[in-house]
Amino acid sequence: MIVRMWHGRVPAGKAAQYRTFLNARAIPDYRSVAGNEAVYILERHDGDVTHFITMTFWHDEAAIRAFAGDDLTRAKYYAEDKEFLLEFEPRVVHYEAVGSVADSAPQ
């Protein structure tokens, strides 16, 4: 399984709106792609900036390609992101999941 990680920063005053957007728009988009196994959105407040990380779990590179296109590590953005993000990081990072244990998904 491949874990795809993206990082973005928003002004702290827009964090709640961006969280709502990610849950309403981005998560359903990820989940609509065959081979997407899970999505987690992480959030960390740091003064006047809030950091978001999306961790998406994919069956294989073919599934990522169906979502992101042929350039597998190129970040994918939505038109609405321009209302929130402080910059547009061009790349994501992929990791191979090599171990796990979970009783249930975080709520």
Give residue ranges: language-model regions:
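Residue-level signal for secondary-structure boundary sites
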Residues: 16, 62-64, 100
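Short, well-ordered beta-strand segments in beta-rich or mixed alpha/beta enzyme
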Residues: 2-9, 38-70
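Glycine-rich beta-strand-turn "strand-cap" elements at beta-sheet edges
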Residues: 2, 37-50, 76-107
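Non-catalytic surface loops within mature trypsin-like serine protease
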Residues: 12, 60, 96-99
